[in-house]
Amino acid sequence: MVGLDPHSAPAVLKAENKLTKDSGTTVDEFVKWQVVSSNGRTYHFSSASGKIWERSAAGTWTLVHTTVAGAGEHKCLGAIEFRGYIVWATESRLHRILATDAEGSSEWTANKVLNWQTFTKTNKYWHPMVEQNLNLYIGDGNQLAEWDGTTFTASALDIKVPLVIKCLGKIGTDVIIGTYIDDSITKTEVFRWNTWSVSFTTSDTIEEVGVNAFIPADNLVYVSAGLSGNIYAYDGQNLDLYKKVQGEYSSTATAIVHPDAVSNFGGQVLFGVSNVSGNPCLQGVYRMGRNSRNYPWIMDLAYPISERNTGAFVISSIEVGSIVTLGQKILVSWKNSTTYGVDLLDTAKLDGAYFETRVMRPDRMAFSMFTDFSIAYNSLPTSTAVTLSYDKNYTGSYTTPTTPQVVDVDRKVISLEEGIEATALQLKAVFTCVTTTTPSIEMLQVSLT
C-alpha cells in the first residue's frame, strides 16, 4: 500500500492525508534534525552547513542563523530542546540559545551562544541527543557526554573503540545507544545504560552494518539496523528481527533510516526510509500501526513526500532526513537530488494512493480465465474513483483494461468485466481523490471461469 489509511475506520480502506511542501524555496539544504520548541516555533538544522531555519506558528519560514563553529565543520549533527534551551551540535562544538530568546533572526543574532562547550572526540558525522532522568546525553564518537543543566561532562560514559555512537534512545529510565563501525564491518552493538553506573548495563551484538535509529513505540522500542530494511524489536536486552521493508537488497542496492527520521504520531510508529544506492525499496515515510489491540500491526508506506514526477509519486532516489510531530500534524524533511524541502501533513487527501494485490496463481501450471472484478465500497464521493489495472504473467508493468468500469450505486459496487487469461495475475487499485474527499472501499473480489 502507498498512501492509504487502513486504520482510522476498521474494515475499510481509504486514502491518507497528503504531505504538502511547507518550506517553499526558503530551505535550500538537506535538513536532518528538527526541534519542536516550547516557544511555539520549530527549528530546522542543515546537514550541509550551519544554516538554521525557523518556522513560526503561522507557518512563516525564515533563515534565522548560520552557525560558524570555533573549530571543525559547521554543519549540524544533532539538536534538541532541553530545560528551555535549544541545543545543537557541530563537529567540535556545542551551541545553545534560550527558546524564549529565539524568536526571529534578530533575537538569534543577539542571544545565541556559540561554542558553548567542546567535544573531546569531535566526531564529524553524528552527535545524537536524548533527554533522560532530567539530564541531556549527547553522542561523541565512542563517548557519551552529559549535561545536567549546570555541569557539562564530556565523557560520562565510554564504550569500546572502534564503535561510534550513531543514535540514542530510551527504554524505561535507561538510555540506549546505537553504534556503527564502518560500511565494510557487518557487526555492531546496542548498549543499555542506567545513566549512573560506571559502565553500561547490558549489550547485544547483531550482524548488521550499524544501528541507524531507535523508533519509539508504546512501551517498547523498534530498531532500524543495517542497509537491508531490517526492523528489530528491542526488549531492553535482546534484538529480535520483527519486520523487513519489502525490497530487493544487495551490495549495490541499499537503504537506511536516518537517526532523526522517526516519530510516534497518534500511537502509530513512523520512520523515513532513504535510498543509499540502487533503490532497493520504495522510499518515504513508513508507518507501523493498528486501530486497537484487537487488530494486527500493519507496516505500509503511508506518506510519500510531496515531490511529483509528471504526476507520479517520487518514491525512489530520495532521502528522508527528519520527522517530528507537531500537534495533529507531522513535519517531514527530504532531499530529492538537488531539491530540498520540509513537508507538512495536509488536510487534503492523497490523490493517486494505491494498493497492489498479491500475485494470484490459481493453477500455476495452466492458464486461468479471470473474468469479473468487483470492488465493494461504502463511500464514493462525487468525482472520486477507484481504478483497476493489471499485470499478467510477471510483465512488470500494469495494463489498463479495455472495457470500462461500471458503478452500481444501489449495491455500492464497482464492477469490471474483462476476460484476462493468465497463469499469474496481479491487480493495482488507484484512488482518485478530490480535495478532502476519498473513496472508501470494503473489499475487492475476483471471479474465474
Segments (PLM) and residue ranges:
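N-terminal beta-propeller domains
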Residues: 1-70, 75-114, 125-126, 133-156, ...
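Non-cytosolic beta-sandwich-type ligand-binding/adhesion modules
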Residues: 55-57, 90-91, 97-102, 295-300, ...
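A short, polar beta-strand/turn micro-motif
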Residues: 152, 157, 198, 237-239, ...
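Blade-level signature of beta-propeller repeat domains, shared across WD40, Kelch, NHL, RCC1
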Residues: 312-358
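Conserved blade-ending motifs and adjacent loop-strand segments that build the rim/top face
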Residues: 246-260, 292-325
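Exposed aromatic-hydrophobic patches
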Residues: 156, 202, 316-320, 409-419
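Beta-propeller fold detector
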Residues: 62-68, 105-117, 153-159, 199-206, ...
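Conserved loop/turn at the beginning of each blade in beta-propeller domains
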Residues: 26-29, 71-73, 120-123, 129, ...
